[in-house]
């Protein structure tokens, strides 16, 4: 697995290519590979019958989920972990409700018919057909220390995910990430050969994502934390292979400190051209974006090496 190359940017399709095609669908990942984008980030939850599935939110999102009669769902509390995989198959996730707040963010996303939430095993089977040396699969395990009964325990989740990873023979192409560092500790203890990336988010005005980085944070497995410049060192001390921060949380100095620790920096989720150029100026190693083709075209236009 090639995480970084000097003077190159690694392009990751975020949830496939969410800006262009329905997120976390097999068609979205096929689209990446057809366009020579060989790295992606995706999300894993667990169904009631303990099948790892590819979806981001703990609950079905009414913004892009239809029932088996073709109607947008209205219930915002349908928990993935409460449904068997057969029950999940009754829902279609191939379109965005463009009237929803979420839908208005991705007005150019194409609609696809009959798109189901995939199993992790299906995505890995698809990925195994990509023979590029640059193939890199970032599996984010969705887990939370804040709310119970949304997932199995971190240990159980890790074992279920790794069962599929080991069947795929893609171990050397996979890096597992999580905001919930308890999950990464389980990977470290049970599967030390698997690379781990540590996700982080520090509160930004106007963004409704929970701050995960603070002293004795449960998201950080209660590790001590006093100031932002020590975060790369903390991650390195945990055996992390990469740091995955929110792109507005970093500075050029933080990237330099991370590189001094031999820790690649892959930022999320960068969709605007000026932010892409800023991240490249900061010398990050990888950029996760909902518009990977946009980033590829920008790199080509600016004579920036990418892989």
Task: For the regions a language model picked out, list residue spans one by one.
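Phosphate-group recognition and catalysis centered on beta-loop-alpha active-site segments
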Residues: 1-307
């Amino acid at each position: 697995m090639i995480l970084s190359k000097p003077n190159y940017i690694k392009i990751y399709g975020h949830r496939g290519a969410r800006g262009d095609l329905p997120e976390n669908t097999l068609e979205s990942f096929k689209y990446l590979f057809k366009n020579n984008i060989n790295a992606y980030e995706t999300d894993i939850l667990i169904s009631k019958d303990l099948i790892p599935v590819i979806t981001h939110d703990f609950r079905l999102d009414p913004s892009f989920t239809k029932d088996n009669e073709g109607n947008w769902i209205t219930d915002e509390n349908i928990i993935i972990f409460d449904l068997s995989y057969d029950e999940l198959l009754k829902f279609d996730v191939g379109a965005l409700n463009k009237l929803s707040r979420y839908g208005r963010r991705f007005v150019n996303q194409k609609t696809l018919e009959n798109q189901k939430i995939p199993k992790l095993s299906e995505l890995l089977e698809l990925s195994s057909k990509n023979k590029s040396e640059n193939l890199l699969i970032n599996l984010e395990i969705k887990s939370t220390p804040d709310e119970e009964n949304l997932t199995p325990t971190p240990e159980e989740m890790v074992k279920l995910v790794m069962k599929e990873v080991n069947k795929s023979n893609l171990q050397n192409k996979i890096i597992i990430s999580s905001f919930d560092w308890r999950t990464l500790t389980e990977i470290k203890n049970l599967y030390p050969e698997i690379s781990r990336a540590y996700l982080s988010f520090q509160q930004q005005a106007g963004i409704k994502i929970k701050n995960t980085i603070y002293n004795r944070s449960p998201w950080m497995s209660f590790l001590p934390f006093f100031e932002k410049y020590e975060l790369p060192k903390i991650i390195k001390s945990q055996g992390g292979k990469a740091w995955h921060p929110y792109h507005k949380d970093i500075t050029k100095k933080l990237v330099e400190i991370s590189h001094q620790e031999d820790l690649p920096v892959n930022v999320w989720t960068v969709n605007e051209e000026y932010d892409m150029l800023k991240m490249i100026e900061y010398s990050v190693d990888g950029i996760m974006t909902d518009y990977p083709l946009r980033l590829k075209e920008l790199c080509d236009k600016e004579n920036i090496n990418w892989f």
